[in-house]
Amino acid sequence: SSRSVFNVYNNPDLLQVYNYPNPFSDNTNFTFELRGTTPPEEFKIKIFTVAGRLIREITPSSPLQIGFNKIYWDGKDEDGDEIANGLYFYKIISKHGEEVKTVTQKLAKVK
């Protein structure tokens, strides 16, 4: 008798992560695709200066879905102040059970 083995990936996978516009002047949207059977239990986007200082943490305002998602950012820091022109990094953190996926990319503010 033959036996077939296959894997079922239930945990969400994070793909096609980018922000547009990039560079941006006032605001930008983070877009990404989630694959799997259920969305992550925890999801956040952290924005850092090039020196590594956390200036903003964004959580989705509505539940994420399997497929394409978009999260808006107003270009402001935690205090509600507009960020200065320059280069920044954003880190997307997706948690599902014990599994954590992260993606880090650059974004630029130009006015």
Task: Please name every model-derived segment.
Residues 32-34, 75, 92, 109:
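C-terminal beta-strand of the catalytic ATP-binding
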Residues 49-50, 77:
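Short, acidic, Ser/Thr-enriched surface-loop or helix-capping motifs
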Residues 70-83:
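Signal that preferentially marks extracellular ectodomain short beta-strand elements
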Residues 55-56, 83:
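Generic structural signal for well-ordered beta-strand positions
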Residues 2-10, 17, 81-111:
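C-terminal tail/sorting-segment detector
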Residues 7-20, 24-49, 57-65, 69-70, ...:
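Glycine-centered coil/turn sites that cap beta-strands in beta-rich domains
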